[in-house]
């Protein structure tokens, strides 16, 4: 059975591997730009959600922007009969833009309050376990509106806890924690994106902030499925997320960790085990596009990398700097 960890100073006990749910909504596009991970039939999405429950996953991370709300809709429909046994994490602040880009950022009080109401409806629930801003604050006005919205959301019982998804804006994450604005912080961290996190982890421990790792498989680049030279189709958001040089550089880096793969563990399992080797981490939230892939991810909860392997990983990462 998958292990559980406490989410910071909250009273939430989360499966140390959750399910990132971006892909569950299927294909969507804005201004001819894909904002999904390709097609996914609703039946496949429901099969993955049901399998997650069977495997012991109790935490599902989504956002109102994911497939323009369809990820939330599918989750709400599939999980409404077991609401008390699971945790819904969702996010707001990324807004579909029909001008010259796929999205804009809106962290205003009115937008966040309206967004959580829409998410509650799509998720078919009367409360959300963790409501997060989806983008980092850009100004003092943003910090102020976030504080006001989070206070209202909690006092009205619409969310039990509030947090921020800051991607790789680590200093912003530290500032949010020091101001006492967040119960959790979601950020990027993986074998090929190791990041300087010692200060952030130290502040999180001091403030009791739960750490959620997004993209622990680097959007699939650590699964072993994609080799240097791979090009994602236009229907996949990854086609637009990276220029080709950066994509190929990340894929080349991923090949340096093949020594972690053996008959007892896959590339994905090794990558997730690396994340879970950090006690500061409460949960990582890889996505999955099949039940088979999901089951493989869950098995990482039973794997531990050796001290020698962790040291070799550290040496490889330091050589990149």
Please tell me what each predicted stretch does.
Residues 39-52, 107-123, 168-175:
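Short, acidic/polar
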Residues 61-62, 75, 88-90, 164, ...:
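Hydrophobic residues in well-ordered beta-strands that form the structural core
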Residues 1-86:
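N-terminal binding-site loop/beta-alpha segment at the start of enzyme catalytic domains
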Residues 85-98:
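A short, structured active-site edge motif that brings together acidic residues
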Residues 26-31, 95-102, 293:
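A short acidic, helix-capping loop that chelates divalent metal ions and anchors anionic groups
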Residues 120-139:
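Active-site groove signature of glycoside hydrolases
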Residues 33-44, 70, 103-111, 141-145, ...:
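Alpha-helix N-cap and loop-to-helix initiation/capping positions
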Residues 137-321:
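Beta/alpha (TIM)-barrel catalytic core signal, keyed to glycine-rich beta->alpha loops juxtaposed to Asp/Glu
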């Amino acid at each position: 059975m998958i292990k559980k960890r406490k989410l910071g100073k909250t009273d939430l006990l989360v499966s140390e591997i959750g399910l990132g749910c971006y892909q569950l909504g299927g294909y969507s596009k804005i201004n001819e730009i894909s904002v999904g991970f390709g097609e996914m039939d609703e039946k496949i999405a429901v099969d993955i959600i049901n399998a997650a429950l069977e495997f012991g996953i109790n935490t599902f991370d989504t956002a109102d922007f994911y497939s323009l709300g369809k990820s939330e809709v599918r989750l709400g429909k599939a999980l409404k009969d077991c609401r008390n046994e699971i945790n819904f994490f969702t996010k707001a602040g990324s807004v579909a833009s029909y001008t010259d880009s796929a999205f804009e950022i809106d962290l205003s009080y009115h937008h966040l309050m309206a967004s959580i109401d829409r998410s509650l409806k799509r998720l078919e629930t009367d409360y959300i376990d963790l409501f997060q801003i989806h983008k980092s604050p850009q100004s003092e006005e943003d910090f102020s509106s976030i504080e006001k919205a989070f206070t209202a959301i909690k006092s009205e019982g619409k969310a039990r806890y509030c947090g921020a998804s800051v991607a790789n804006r680590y200093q912003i994450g530290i500032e949010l924690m020091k101001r006492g604005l967040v119960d959790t912080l979601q950020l990027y961290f993986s074998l090929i994106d190791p990041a300087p996190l010692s200060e952030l982890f130290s502040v999180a421990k001091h403030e009791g902030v739960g750490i959620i790792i997004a993209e622990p498989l680097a959007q699939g680049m650590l699964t072993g499925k994609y080799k240097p030279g791979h090009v994602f189709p236009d229907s996949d958001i990854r086609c637009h997320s990276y220029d080709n040089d950066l994509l190929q550089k990340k894929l080349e880096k991923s090949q340096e960790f093949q020594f972690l793969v053996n008959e007892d563990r896959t590339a994905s399992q090794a990558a997730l085990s690396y994340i879970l080797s950090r006690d500061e981490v409460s949960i990582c939230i890889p996505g999955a596009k099949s039940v088979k892939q999901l089951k493989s991810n869950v098995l990482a909860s039973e794997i531990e990398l050796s001290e020698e392997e962790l040291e070799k990983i550290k040496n490889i990462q330091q050589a990149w700097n």
